């Protein structure tokens, strides 16, 4: 699992930042999954809106968060010289882009 490998990487003083990135990414994956479940339960849009009247605002915030993570991973990919870390960050970037795309797909189905 890419998150497990990232959590084991030692990046000196930035290991705390890396752990924060992993936590945020896991949170985004859970959010993506909840959007997917709402889509699967068709007609759950009303329930989603009732449960969280500000769900569009929350969705916007999650997209900002994932864009920030994507940029952060791209930056780390550029500055990393270790090939193992480069591969790990490339895989993380691919996973982030997939999660972002799935969130977009689910959100368009809910709107």
Curated annotation (Swiss-Prot):
Its primary localisation, in coarse terms, equals: virion
Family note: Belongs to the influenza viruses NEP family.
**Which keywords does this Swiss-Prot/TrEMBL entry list?**
Host nucleus, Host-virus interaction, Transport, Virion
Record's keyword annotation contains Transport: yes
Motif Nuclear export signal, residue range(s) on this chain? 2-11, 75-84
In its keyword annotation, does this UniProt entry include Transport? yes
Q: Which domain of life is it from?
A: Viruses
Do you know which InterPro entries this protein is assigned to? Flu_NS2
Task: Give the CC-aspect GO terms.
Answer: host cell nucleus; virion component
Could you describe the subunit structure of this protein? Binds M1 protein. May interact with human nucleoporin RAB/HRB and exportin XPO1/CRM1.
General function of this protein: Mediates the nuclear export of encapsidated genomic RNAs (ribonucleoproteins, RNPs). Acts as an adapter between viral RNPs complexes and the nuclear export machinery of the cell. Possesses no intrinsic RNA-binding activity, but includes a C-terminal M1-binding domain. This domain is believed to allow recognition of RNPs to which the M1 protein is bound.
Q: Where in the cell is it found?
A: Virion; Host nucleus
* GO BP annotations, alphabetical order: exit of virus from host cell nucleus through nuclear pore
Q: What gene does this protein come from?
A: NS
Q: Which organism is it from?
A: Influenza A virus (strain A/Teal/China/2978.1/2002 H5N1 genotype W)
User: May I ask which residue range the UniProt record assigns to the signal sequence?
Assistant: none
Extra notes?
A: Average number present in a viral particle is estimated to be 130-200 molecules.
| Record protein name field | Nuclear export protein
């Amino acid at each position: 699992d890419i998150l497990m490998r990232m959590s084991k990487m030692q990046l000196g003083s930035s290991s705390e930042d890396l752990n924060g990135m992993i936590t945020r990414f896991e949170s985004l994956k859970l959010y993506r999954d909840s959007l997917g479940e709402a889509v699967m339960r068709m007609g759950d849009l009303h329930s989603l809106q009732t449960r969280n009247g500000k769900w569009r605002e929350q969705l916007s915030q999650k997209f900002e968060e994932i864009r920030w993570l994507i940029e952060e991973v791209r930056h780390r990919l550029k500055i990393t010289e270790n090939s193992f870390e480069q591969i790990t960050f490339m895989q993380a970037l691919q996973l982030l882009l997939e999660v972002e795309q799935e969130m977009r797909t689910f959100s368009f189905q809910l709107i």
